[in-house]
Amino acid sequence: PLVIQDKKLNQDGSLRYPALWMDHWFGDKVMVNGKIWPYLSVKKGKYRFKLLNGSTSRVYTLSLVPPSGTLNFTVVGDEGGLLEAPVPGVGALTIGPGERYEVIVDFAGYAAGDHVLMQNSAGAPFPNGPADLLQVMEFRVTSQNGDTDPLPATVRPIQRVDPAQARQARDFRLK
């Protein structure tokens, strides 16, 4: 998994927390799995990442920035588990605190030595604050070939509930 969090650090590298309670809190550094601005070496092929926003208050709008062209996420899962079918062509993914997504990223079209950035464009506080933490992490493409198999059309078959089979119907009125 890629656990994305914003943190503030003291001069010695220890975590700095506010002395008083705050209704929301934003760090000045983005960490992925406990590291600031990390990189991951990737083969030319597909990777499945579980993304988790582990921040206290910050919302992220994540996108991938390759050396040229565009690179999109294919979403295969969310809070409810695996989706019925992959959702390709997702250019930006907005993810709130505690929220999870499972995505496929395909690095097959890139050359060894290419760098793909994962960036955040969401403001803090969301949605109208300044986008102050842009860099999240970097993927470095190696010369090795990875998984290039096509994604299945169905990730997880979902059996639909037939409303006609309900034994009892209830109406809820909220005031």
Language-model segments: residues:
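Conserved, compact domain cores that house catalytic/ligand-binding motifs in diverse enzymes
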Residues: 165-175
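Histidine- and aromatic-rich segments of cupredoxin/plastocyanin-like copper-binding domains
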Residues: 3-162, 166
